[in-house]
């Protein structure tokens, strides 16, 4: 199970803990949120090698993750190292933005609409271009970047077509439907995402 802090609990593990049998061995792995590529790659190498070693020893091994394992997930860096062995099965998950769409009753895309999933770590010019080009957008990794993204939405005239949700489906879930009223320095949880649909009227 991945853990955001060394020695800390795993959010993914807390969600599935009640379904884990007493005989199941659980290991939490700290994946550093660091700009140091060498540090991160060393951890990915170590965890991937340990996972393969356990499987080759005859054990059934699972790696749990939040959302879908193939979208903005630490798992993909392990997958690069593991390859495509016959024993590997990846179970589809529910993406955060699919959960947000359901919780907010906001469609992601309809009929001929285009849908773009954008990381807010992208250059501002790329985000601005995406806001112009697409009918519906998912803006992920908003944490620490809200003021910049809010300004881009305002420039595009899309503040009223957007909503933001944090920690969707979790006990701390929060939703903001009027982004123009949200302060630029509003404290946000790490898991915060913005949905934009230019052709949908939100219930107030």
Model-derived features with residue positions:
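Class I SAM-dependent methyltransferase SAM-binding "motif I" and its flanking Rossmann-like core
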Residues: 67-133, 185, 199-202
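A contiguous loop/helix-start segment that scaffolds small-molecule binding in enzyme catalytic cores
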Residues: 2-3, 14, 131-204
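A short acidic, often aromatic-flanked loop/helix-cap motif at beta-alpha or helix-coil junctions
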Residues: 32-37, 97, 123-125, 170-172
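General beta-strand structural signal in soluble alpha/beta enzymes
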Residues: 28, 63-65, 90-93, 110, ...
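Class I S-adenosyl-L-methionine
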Residues: 1-85, 150, 175-176, 189-193, ...
């Amino acid at each position: 199970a991945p853990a955001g802090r060394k020695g800390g609990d795993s959010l993914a593990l807390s969600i599935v803990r009640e379904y884990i049998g007493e005989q199941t061995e659980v290991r939490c792995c700290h994946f550093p949120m660091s700009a140091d590529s060498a540090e991160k790659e060393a951890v990915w190498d170590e965890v991937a090698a340990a996972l393969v070693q356990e499987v080759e020893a005859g054990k059934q091994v699972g790696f749990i993750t939040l959302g879908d394992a193939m979208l903005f997930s630490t798992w993909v860096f392990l997958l690069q190292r593991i390859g495509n062995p016959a024993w590997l099965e990846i179970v589809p998950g529910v993406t955060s933005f699919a959960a947000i769409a359901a919780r907010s009753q906001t469609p992601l895309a309809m009929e001929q609409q285009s849908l773009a999933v954008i990381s807010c770590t992208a250059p501002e010019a790329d985000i601005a271009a995406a806001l112009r080009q697409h009918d519906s957008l998912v803006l992920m990794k908003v944490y620490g970047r809200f003021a910049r993204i809010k300004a881009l939405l305002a420039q595009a005239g899309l503040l009223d077509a957007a909503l933001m949700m944090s920690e969707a489906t979790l006990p701390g879930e929060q939703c903001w439907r009027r982004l123009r009223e949200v302060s630029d320095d509003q404290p946000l949880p790490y898991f915060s995402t913005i949905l934009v649909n230019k052709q949908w009227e939100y219930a107030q």
